[in-house]
Amino acid sequence: MQKVVLATGNAGKVRELASLLSDFGLDVVAQTKLGVDSAEETGLTFIENAILKARHAAKMTGLPAIADDSGLAVDVLGGAPGIYSARYSGENATDQQNLEKLLHTLRDVPDDKRQARFHCVLVYLRHAEDPTPIVCHGSWPGVITRQAAGNGGFGYDPIFFVPSEGKTAAELTREEKSAISHRGQALKLLLDALRNG
């Protein structure tokens, strides 16, 4: 099996990707298990940050790398919190603090102006100097609610209402969410690219 470094320390992401990518002969290992620190995210877009993270992991390990950069873009806020989704209310902010700040920011915004979408970019680099990385983007439209609902998921899921499902992302089962989410879409594109290429 070809070892691939995943540019994250998130055990959940590693487990999810490891099971799916093993069918392609890829053995996914978290960068933290290989002693690699997180890359500095200096890009201005999800794509730039995902490439920075993948390139850093590949360079430090000499292995192919996969990186994910994702976040929430709210239309009325010009795409914010965007690449700052995880640190919207400060550098070491919790999910709850970020969620509360967003609800406070949108408190006077009418219901018909609360559209948002989650974005996920997955990047695969064959090596650190790979001039043609595989870049896959998934996007998931929804509406920001006025209060949290549901206990599943993480981040902004409890206030991200999915009209097609009639509930928030936090109220979906893991399987339901994976089938339609931004990360699920990006992962499907990556698997298709690896299968075909």
Swiss-Prot record:
The cofactor note from the UniProt entry for this protein is:
Binds 1 Mg(2+) ion per subunit.
The active site lies at D69 (proton acceptor)
**Where along the chain is Mg(2+) bound?**
E40, D69
Q: What is its EC number?
A: 3.6.1.66
Swiss-Prot/TrEMBL cofactor(s): Mg(2+)
Spell out the reaction equation it catalyses: XTP + H2O = XMP + diphosphate + H(+); dITP + H2O = dIMP + diphosphate + H(+); ITP + H2O = IMP + diphosphate + H(+)
One of the protein's GO biological processes: nucleotide metabolic process
Please provide, alphabetically and separated by semicolons, the GO molecular function terms listed in this UniProt record.
dITP diphosphatase activity; ITP diphosphatase activity; metal ion binding; nucleotide binding; ribonucleoside triphosphate phosphatase activity; XTP diphosphatase activity
Q: SUPFAM superfamilies in the record, alphabetically? A: ITPase-like (SSF52972)
Superkingdom of this entry's organism?
Bacteria
Q: Does the keyword section mention Lyase? A: no
Q: Which family does it belong to?
A: Belongs to the HAM1 NTPase family.
| Protein name, UniProt field | dITP/XTP pyrophosphatase
The source organism is Salmonella typhi
